[in-house]
Amino acid sequence: MADQRDPLEYNWGREHGKRLHVTYDESIAQRPGFSEHTANGIEGAGYDMKERQKRLRSRTAKKTIGILAALLIFLSSTYCFLIYSNIPFIAKWRTIYIETAMGTMTHHWLAEAFIPQNVIDQVMNSRSTIEEEQKGLSSSWSTNTEEAIDYTQAVRPWDQLKSEFTTYYSEIDWDTLKSYLQKHGSSCIDSDGYLYIDEADYGDEDTGIRTTKGDPVCVLDTRNGIVIVTLKGDSYYGKMALVKCASQVSVAASDALGSEGEFIQDIVKSHDAILGINASGFYDPNGTGNGGEAYGMIFSNGKRLRGREGCSMKVISLSKDDRLNVSDKKPSDAREAVQFDPVLILDGDLLISGSSGWGLQPRSVIGQTRDGQMMLTVVDGRQAGYSVGITLGDLSDILYKYGAYQACNLDGGSSSLMYYDGRAITSSSSADSERGRHVPDAWIVSKAGS
């Protein structure tokens, strides 16, 4: 078959930057109307197209450079704005971000990789300032004109307690409890006649019982004189245990203290206790410590146990007459003691506001009301979508709202955990969310009458 291609091939490249190809056959001159001018025009078209492609590539390159330059300027401006802005909202969350990163054992780089050291130092100096200001501060109950209530009467069977319930459990909204009792009847009275309500596991149905402050009550245990309140906020989820009899609260240590810590559940079980939370900090290089070597002194039942000497943190102690004290040195009448800081509430005065250099973290705190109730609180954190953590200022406000007269921070982070009646009722941020980490000791609540 004869070749049907036109002797004049005018092939255009379809891809950007491909050269234009023009093929000229001399036989085309035989066509009617063909002239030298026509041939020159065809050859000129190829030249014009190459120039046009060249100009297009140049304009595209300039446009790309312009976009990249604008993006770089935008990102640089945004970075400077976020790092140095004094707008309250920006400054608050920048501060919390820095404090939170620097408050971890192994994630300082989250701040140091992006933020100038002078900005980090400025933020963290507020923490150092507070620690310096708290030196020399000690609890004093001399201004307390309110007599402690005999909370041993809070531990009675329901038929004996019912008429005086609001005296010993004044934090409970009676109407909401009455509605619960009407709905559930005798099912919430145990075999010995004690009122026992336990919906403390995450995901359990809301009891509908509220405190007088409006928070959900998940546990009401009149056998042991314990109320557990669920704490919920925009960034946090936790539990606060109100223990009626301070005499039931003590410090218990790992059996292998000095060489290895234990899970809180094991410490609680070995002492036949009903509840426990973590207490002392411990030597923890790169987050791999085994909880054996505690920071600061540990006193349990009047006896000094092993612990690092020379610790500058506050001494948190319970006296023989069941008063919680915070001081620089152990009081002579202390029966239980550990060390940590900072002090949150001292003699009824709030000492911490906002993040104050400690950021958003999992927290554990111990406190006591003026009338003698103990407050053991754990707030979960570092778990996106569930609980990020809480600032010390916000936690102080919660304790203050519930009448804390003394309160001090305990070791937090991945060590924070509350164990009650055979299981964890908060979630550790460690690899083992139910058991948490090995710790040197715990604040425990003994079973009533034991």
Tell what function each PLM region has.
Residues 2-450:
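Gly/Ser/Thr/Pro-rich low-complexity, intrinsically disordered segments
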